[in-house]
Every structure is written in structure tokens, then in C-alpha cells.
UniProtKB/Swiss-Prot annotation:
It is found in: Cytoplasm. This is Oligoribonuclease. One of its GO terms (cellular component) is cytoplasm. Transmembrane segments: none annotated. Its main location: cytoplasm. GO terms for biological process: DNA metabolic process. The keyword Secreted does not apply. The active site is at residue 129. Its EC number is 3.1.15.-. It comes from Enterobacter sp. (strain 638). Residues 8-171 form the Exonuclease domain. InterPro entries: Exonuclease_RNaseT/DNA_pol3, Oligoribonuclease, RNaseH-like_sf, RNaseH_sf. Disulfide bonds: none annotated.
Amino acid sequence: MSADENNLIWIDLEMTGLDPERDRIIEIATLVTDANLNILAEGPTIAVHQSDAQLALMDDWNVRTHTGSGLVERVKASTQGDREAELATIEFLKQWIPAGKSPICGNSIGQDRRFLFKYMPELEAYFHYRYLDVSTLKELARRWKPEILDGFKKQGTHQAMDDIRESVAELAFYRENFIKL
């Protein structure tokens, strides 16, 4: 392993909802790729403990999705709160990339960053201010070359590490099939 400033940090959060003023992070996962999207390492996937009262605020979609995946039970059983999950993630990242070098990478990553800013500010500050958001390419493809979207299908498990792996694969798909290099 080597800390390389060209490596990319990919992150995904599962939350109890979409409003960081009301909802909370219930799962965090990270992985690191090189600049060519080769996966170098998978970080910890952490179920972040939240109270029963917080979990009771979830809407039907979140209850169904996160109960069906087993995440709700993992969250209830977890002993790691926001701070412990944040520190474990930072310790992993320090092995692979210096602070402030990687953009935050993922799908619709602005939403995740809002939650990081509120609940894991030290981790949020570890990223460069830029974003590498795969959903930007998806939206451009939808408008400019919609037929390309049939070539990549996501599983949509809404489990953080699975979602990150799909984001990396999706960006690689767009690199090969949409972007002229």
C-alpha cells in the first residue's frame, strides 16, 4: 500500500432519510481506486448505531429497504457511533491518500457530503473540495445519448459497499462507452 495523491476515495452512505437536519447516517463504506479506477483497497463497512427513536422516524421506503437488507438490525446491534465510524474511516484513508487530495467520489455524492458535513466533519474535511459525481455523466448520457443507459444496469441493493463498487463500474462503463478519450 502507498499513499498516492492521485488515488481516488469513493464513499457511500446509507441514511434514515434525505434531510441531514432530521435524518442520520446508518452505514458508511469507502474504497480507494487508482486514477484508472482499479480498486486498490476496500475500507471498513460500518453500521452506525442510531437509537430506536431515530430509526422510527424513517419513511416507508427506508424502513422497507433497510430492514430488507438487514441493515436496521446491524445498526441496532452496532456499538459504533458517528465519531467511531468517522475515525475508523479516516485511519483507513490515511494509508492510501494524503488529506485534501482526492475529490469525493460516488453517485449523487453531494447528498452524502451534506451528511458528512453535519455528522462527520473531520472526514468531510479530508476530501478535496471538488466532486467526482458519476450521476453527472448519467444525466448527460440521458440527454445526449440515452441508448447508452441500457448498457449498464445497477443492482440497487442500497448497501454501501455494493453501491460504491457499482459507482466505480458505472464510471468505467461511461469512460469506455460515452467519453471520447
